[in-house]
Amino acid sequence: MRHTVRVAIIGLAFGLVAGVAPASAQIDLVGEWLTPRAVQPDGAIAQQLEDGPHRAEGPELGDYTGLPINDFARKKAEAWSASVLSQPERQGNPHPAQYSMRGGGGPNLRISKIIDPVTTEWLGYRIEGFYGGANRTIWMDGRPHPSANAEHTWDGFSTGLWEGNMLTVTTTHMKMAFIQRNGVPSSPYGTMTEHFARHGNYLTVMTVIDDPLFLEEPLMRTVTFVWTPQQNVGAPTLFDPSDELGNRPLGWVPHNAQGSHQTEFATRFGIPFEATQGGKETTYPEYMETLAALRAKQGKR
């Protein structure tokens, strides 16, 4: 069932691309790619058009809507405190591969080819512009993924292959990190599959994350970029760690007590608390019936 649903969604998302070029064609991904952002009447740039609040300011505590997380992930998210990002050893952490395509208000990317300087063989792609400098390499030369015991990094280990005019990338060896910036965790046992499809000057990337530790079903999300050749992706921001936590004892880790419940998001928007907690059932259209029943029950209180 999980495989059937995934294939159907990918086919729906990229079905129009099939008519752009023959099945054997390989689209050109090289260039500067900009995250689309809304432009205000005065010309100022506002937040991006896709999931703006989640990707810029970040989701509110307790907002797990649309995430097929299990109870273990939910408990870890409830215990998470944003102050953990103020620890000196964490202030320079980049966004992990599981999230970096969406993070930092939406990254602006440079995609370039990696060419062997001696043989001129095309080895892969380099993608730069991610928050914190966790730039990625996608190997296209057929090399295998390393042992499960090999080092896990922020960018993971990625290999790609062409499926018609769509690039499919498989990433493993990712650090334990997060899939959303309010504590929703991702484990080092996850696998990420990405599908890159170009529609003229638009590049759509569908991400599918399988995580046996924290997800009940694969998490699927898409992001869109616009080809912007006049853009120039700069160097990563340098971090200078400082004490932001005050007089805390050495080794203290910001956290909420196990069993805590983040209810502010549900209260603020008048959403039944149960509907904010994620889970695979909340990602399907049929959940609208459950939501209606929860709202009716909420109205009687």
Question: What would you call each of these model-derived segments?
Answer:
Residues 8-19:
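Bacterial N-terminal signal peptides
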Residues 24-301:
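PEST-like low-complexity, intrinsically disordered acidic/proline/serine-rich tracts
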Residues 1-6:
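Positively charged n-region of N-terminal signal peptides that target proteins for export
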